[in-house]
């Protein structure tokens, strides 16, 4: 699944240009840390691992920029707590 990179995250559009999946982040006072603050997936895509793929895209992008992620949205908080493979990018580890 392909996502479009935006100024503050990644999105998936449907054929009409409507956002059907999105993960966003905001910058912090520390230029090496961003806050993952919002993840949403349209009900038509739920159960397909789309939120995880969005998070993977964000993690890859931030890793390439040598930045860490602080989890704020409930989905990312849960993933960071449950999966230690994210420890390398987790700003709170």
Task: State where each predicted segment sits.
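Conserved beta-hairpin
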Residues: 9-20
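C-terminal structural segments of small proteins and small subunits
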Residues: 61-93
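Active-site rim helix/loop that mediates acceptor-substrate recognition in acyltransferases
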Residues: 1-10
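Conserved beta-strand in the GNAT
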Residues: 18-26, 35
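A conserved beta-turn-beta hairpin within the catalytic core of GNAT-like acetyltransferases
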Residues: 28-36, 68
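A short, internal acetyl-CoA/4′-phosphopantetheine-binding micro-motif in the GNAT/acyltransferase core
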Residues: 39-46
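Conserved acetyl-CoA-binding loop-helix of GNAT-fold acetyltransferases
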Residues: 47-58
């Amino acid at each position: 699944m392909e996502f479009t990179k935006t100024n503050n995250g990644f999105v998936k559009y449907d054929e009409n240009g409507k956002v059907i999946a999105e993960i966003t982040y905001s910058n912090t006072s520390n230029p090496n840390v961003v806050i993952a603050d919002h993840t949403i997936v349209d009900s038509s895509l739920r159960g397909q691992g789309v939120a995880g793929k969005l998070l993977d895209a964000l993690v890859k992008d931030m890793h390439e920029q040598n930045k860490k992620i602080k989890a704020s949205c409930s989905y990312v908080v849960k993933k960071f707590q449950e999966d230690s493979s994210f420890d390398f990018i987790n700003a709170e580890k």
